[in-house]
Structure formats: C-alpha cells, structure tokens
Design a protein with these regions (language model features):
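Short glycine/proline- and aromatic-enriched beta-strand/turn motifs that initiate or cap beta-hairpins
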Residues: 19-66, 166
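Outer-membrane beta-barrel proteins
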Residues: 35-39, 58-60, 84-90, 121, ...
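Membrane-embedded beta-strand positions in outer-membrane beta-barrel channels/transporters
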Residues: 25, 46-48, 74, 107-109, ...
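Outer-membrane beta-barrel "beta-signal"
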Residues: 46-50, 203, 233-246
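Outer-membrane beta-barrel transmembrane domain signature
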Residues: 129-131, 135-139, 143-212, 217-224, ...
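Transmembrane beta-barrel strands of outer-membrane/channel proteins
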Residues: 24-32, 51, 62, 77-83, ...
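Repeated loop/turn-to-beta-strand initiation elements of outer-membrane beta-barrel proteins
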Residues: 55-58, 73, 118-123, 151-154, ...
C-alpha cells in the first residue's frame, strides 16, 4: 500500500509540472479519538495529503474520479484504502485480549453531492454507498458551509449510515475461537446504524497557510453497543492542525 501511494504521489507531481489544473494541499494534525472497542484511546499525528488533477483526486486514503461535475451536482467513484477499523487483541483491555485482529478493508464507493439551493446555496446533501470484501455501508449526510469572515469558514454536518450484516459481524461480532477471559458468549449481530455529527473550522493566515480544528461525534445502535467487545458510549474525535495549500 505504501508503494502504491508513493506511486500516486509521483504521478501527481508529474501532472503538476505539466498542467495548471493540478491542485494540492498537505495537512498535519494532532487528534485524539475514543475507541468503540474496549481498549485504550487512540492518539495520532496524521498527515492528510490532498491532490486533484482535472477529475482525478486523492484525499487522505481515498482515491476517486468525478464523472459528473456541475454547479449544483457532482458525483464520484472512489476507492477507500482504509475503510472500517483496525484493532489488535494486545490493544484491548484485560479480559478482552483473546479477540482476533480486525483489519481495514479496501472499499469501492459511489458518492454524490446535491446543493439544496432552494433552502441555501451553502447546504449540501450527500448520499453514498461503498462495499468491500468485509461488507458495505450506505450513508446520507447533510453539511452547511458558513463563511464567518473572508478568512474564516465553519462547517457543521450531520450524517447517518447503515452498516450491513456482514460488515457489523466482522468488526463487532464474536466467534467461538475468541471466547476467553471476560468474553463468555458468541455474538452475531445484524446490520446496524451509525449516527454522526461534526463541526469543522478553518482560519486562513495567508492564501497558502491555514489552521484548522474539528470535532466529530458518533453513536451506534444497539447491534453494536450490545457486543461484548464494544463500549456503549458516544465516540468522539477531536483534533487541530495546520494546512499548506500549494
């Protein structure tokens, strides 16, 4: 995967020299996130590359292609290289370390953005669907872009996703060979819902340099929260960072 991403970066670099349609930014952020699993909180210093060349784009772990792009509507097909969750038994709390490792999946998806100009030109409705070898997700999001000042933007959002039976069972179910310690029963959940809300803000120091901050929260329905290996709580993801736009 690392070699593949480096290849993509090299291709985009060549494109940047050859064509003015190339756009790029790099974000370095520090964030903290509570885990859905019964384990330690996860900390990280992620680097988010963002590149676009005509209709082709790379955004974090997502590589996509826009095949419709109009003023009020655009759609894209994409591949997410890091969809899902990744957890090892060694990261779990005492009594729950017998679980097998859960791994990210590579998912292919479709996404569309509809500007709801009848309500506000800054309001966007986003339906999506993605599927990988470990299951599928269907989502619907609503976001609003508000320019507080010329150099300050704020964007609140809400979304709901349905995670398929296969997806939910792989990441949150419990098989017989995982029993041990505090895990005493198998668990085979049906599909579940994920409800989310977020707030993103960005302050531009210059045309190229900006600071950003974000907070995201999500809650799962009972199919996930009743799992022996998960926590019944609101999952939060809070962070801040700097972005450089080329």
């Amino acid at each position: 995967m690392k070699k593949y991403l480096l290849t993509m970066l090299a291709l985009f670099s060549v494109a940047a020299v050859a064509n003015d349609d190339f756009k790029a930014s790099v974000t370095a952020a520090y964030g903290t996130r509570t885990s859905i699993y019964k384990g330690r909180e996860e900390y990280g210093i992620p680097i988010f590359p963002s590149f676009s060349y005509q209709n082709l784009y790379l955004k974090g772990s997502e590589i996509g292609f826009k095949f419709f792009d109009y003023d009020r509507f655009n759609s894209s097909i994409y591949v997410d290289l890091l969809d899902g969750y990744s957890i090892k038994g060694s990261r779990m709390d005492t009594g729950y370390k017998s679980i097998n490792r859960r791994r990210y999946q590579q998912a292919v998806g479709l996404q569309a953005n509809f500007k709801l100009n009848e309500i506000s030109e800054n309001l966007t409705l986003t339906p999506s669907f993605s599927i990988g070898n470990r299951g599928s997700k269907t989502g619907l999001g609503l976001s609003y872009l508000y320019m507080l000042q010329e150099n300050i933007i704020i964007s609140p959002s809400v979304n709901v996703k349905y995670l398929s039976n296969k997806y939910t069972d792989y990441y949150f179910g419990v098989d017989r060979d995982e029993l041990g310690g505090s895990i005493r029963n198998e668990y085979n959940p049906d599909g579940t819902f994920e409800f989310g809300a977020g707030l993103y803000g960005e302050y531009y120091f210059t045309r190229n340099i900006s600071a950003l901050a974000y907070v995201n929260m999500k809650q799962y329905s009972s199919e996930v929260t009743k799992s022996p290996i998960t926590e019944d709580r609101i999952i939060t993801n809070v962070g801040a960072g700097l972005k450089y736009t080329f």
